[in-house]
């Protein structure tokens, strides 16, 4: 396990799940810690000001990291949180940047309520997480980049067969099953317009993207995770969070 991935895991699990926020953020972050989770201020003290009260409010914290993607200096993780015996359940997606020592220096995220029932019948976070096909990393990243451009941004849905398998499994809570359900969701007003692809990371058969979408009068940060086989998307997950108004930010913003 690379040092940066190990540090991300430990910050998440030691710092938040186990409640050792102060020691974890001091050990696993670098000279700066730029924060894009808008409720959290920059730096060690910003992290502590948010998470020490969070730990106190939520003494029962079940946190499971479902999947990791490591791409150079970046680590992406996809996690499930159940707080206080399931009184609150969340899906979180996070991207971390690191310095040359593998210490965390920047963080982006989205959080949304975990939904027990989805339109496709698939669980929001379930599914494979094994990284394989490392030799196909660059090809798969390029394929997802074109998918975002041609399908999500340009809405050339007649090209969907070039990117998605017929049996594509969809874990989006608001998309119906299959490739047709996926297209219908991307055409909907609730999905809206995919304005900007901000980051794209990949490792083997998994690729994750962060983008800004605009739907129903609001800007959102949208994470998507794709699993590919033979160059086609065979499974996908999402996590979408509305961006709070500027006067509610404690840092420079989501991006």
State where each predicted segment sits:
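C-terminal and inter-domain tail/linker signature
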Residues: 1-255
